[in-house]
């Protein structure tokens, strides 16, 4: 059975801010664009956490709900909520089959929660996932290094626009959000 998938999510910590950007394309299989304006970046826990997903849409929504529940349970502690979600993800037979990845961030931490329950905090404050993730990551690293005067939001938007120019599964209908 074909699934709805393909997207790019990019996040960066820079100059005291964190920004996250996601495109709006939802693809059915490898041949049909079903939606151009999906919102894959959201605020969670009283607006203090940014979260973005890539992968199967239904699976990602399930993970959003689970992660939001963990944030509430652990009073907004991003790292603890991520660890507890990862534990549950690895142990639960149904969750283990979910095909999605998430980037979550608050002002202090930026984390990747992978499809196999791994949690990764980048050394350089930049993460990208999805079909255009490699392109966005390369652009973001270059901008953060060689254009440090840009803000986190500008880096996130430019990185995702670069990915959209290259990746057929990424479009220019961006949602960009920032925590200062």
UniProtKB/Swiss-Prot annotation:
GO terms for cellular component: HslUV protease complex; proteasome core complex. Its EC number is 3.4.25.2. It catalyses: ATP-dependent cleavage of peptide bonds with broad specificity. Na(+) binds at residues 164, 167, 170. One of its GO terms (molecular function) is metal ion binding. The active site is at residue 7. It is an enzyme of class 3 (hydrolase). Pfam families: Proteasome. One of its GO terms (biological process) is proteolysis involved in protein catabolic process. InterPro entries: ATP-dep_Prtase_HsIV_su, Ntn_hydrolases_N, Proteasome_sua/b, Proteasome_suB-type. Allosterically activated by HslU binding. PROSITE patterns: PROTEASOME_BETA_2 (PS51476). The keyword Hydrolase applies. Its main location: cytoplasm. Protease subunit of a proteasome-like degradation complex believed to be a general protein degrading machinery. A double ring-shaped homohexamer of HslV is capped on each side by a ring-shaped HslU homohexamer. The assembly of the HslU/HslV complex is dependent on binding of ATP. Belongs to the peptidase T1B family. HslV subfamily. This is ATP-dependent protease subunit HslV.
């Amino acid at each position: 059975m074909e699934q709805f998938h393909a997207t790019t999510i990019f996040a960066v910590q820079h100059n005291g801010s964190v920004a996250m950007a996601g495109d709006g394309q939802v693809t059915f299989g490898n041949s049909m664009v079903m939606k151009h304006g999906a919102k894959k970046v959201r605020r969670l826990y009283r607006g203090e956490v940014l979260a973005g997903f890539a992968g199967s849409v239904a699976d990602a929504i399930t993970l959003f709900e689970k992660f939001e529940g963990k944030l509430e349970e652990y009073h907004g502690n991003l790292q603890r909520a991520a660890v507890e979600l990862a534990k549950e993800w690895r142990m639960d037979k149904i969750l283990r089959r979910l095909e999605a990845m998430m980037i979550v961030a608050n002002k202090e931490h930026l984390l990747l929660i992978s499809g196999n329950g791994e949690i990764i905090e980048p050394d350089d404050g930049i993460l990208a996932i999805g079909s255009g993730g490699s392109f966005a990551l390369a652009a973001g690293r270059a901008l953060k290094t060689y254009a440090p005067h840009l803000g986190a939001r500008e880096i996130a938007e430019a990185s995702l626009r670069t990915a959209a120019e290259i990746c057929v599964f990424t479009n220019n209908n961006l949602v960009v959000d920032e925590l200062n």
